Amino acid sequence: MHQSSFGGFAEPHPTDRLFFAVMPPPDVAERVASLAGQLREQLRLRGRPRPTGHLHVTLHHLGDFAGLPQQLVDGACAAAASVALPSFEARFDRVGSFRGRVGKHPFVLLGAERASGLAGLYGSLGMRLAAAGLARREPAFVPHVTLLYDALTIAPQPVEPFEWTVREFVLIHSLLGRTEYRVLGRWPLAAGA
C-alpha cells in the first residue's frame, strides 16, 4: 500500500501543466496544421491533429500540478525576464515519430540540423531557471512541434521547410484534459538577429 493512499489521502490528480515554449506565427501554424492533415491521410495515421493554436516548441516543462502553483509561476516569470538574447530564425524540415507510450507515439515536425537559436534559448532559459532553483531533470533537447499522437511510428522523412523568425517565448498554462492553453507571460527577444 502506498502511503499516499493510506487513510483516504490520495495524491491529488494533476489538473494544470506549466511549460515554456516558442510558438510559430499564426500563418506558419496554419501551414503546419495543413501539413499535419495531409500527412495524416497519406500515412494512414488515425490520431487527431493538434489544434492550430496549440502548435509549439517546448523549451522547458515545469511540471504537472493539482492547481496552479502561483509561487512557481512568479519564480519562472522572474527567471524568464532575465533572458537577454537576439531574435533568430527557426527552421523545421523533417517529420517522424518519437517513442511514446504504447499506442501513443508523438508524430512530430523536427528542427533542422542548424537549430542553434532554439538550443541557445533553451540553454539560456535553463540556466536562469536553475539559478532560481526551478530546474528539472530533462531529456536532451530535440526541437520539435508535435503534430499528433498515433499508434504507428513513422521513420524520419524530409518535408518542405517551415521557417520563421522567433521574436519571443511564452509561459503556457495548459488545463489538462480540457485542450485549453493560457499564455501567462511573453518575453521578447531583441530585434536584429
Pin down the residues of each PLM region:
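Histidine-dependent nucleotide/RNA phosphoesterase domain, centered on the 2H-phosphoesterase fold
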Residues: 1-193
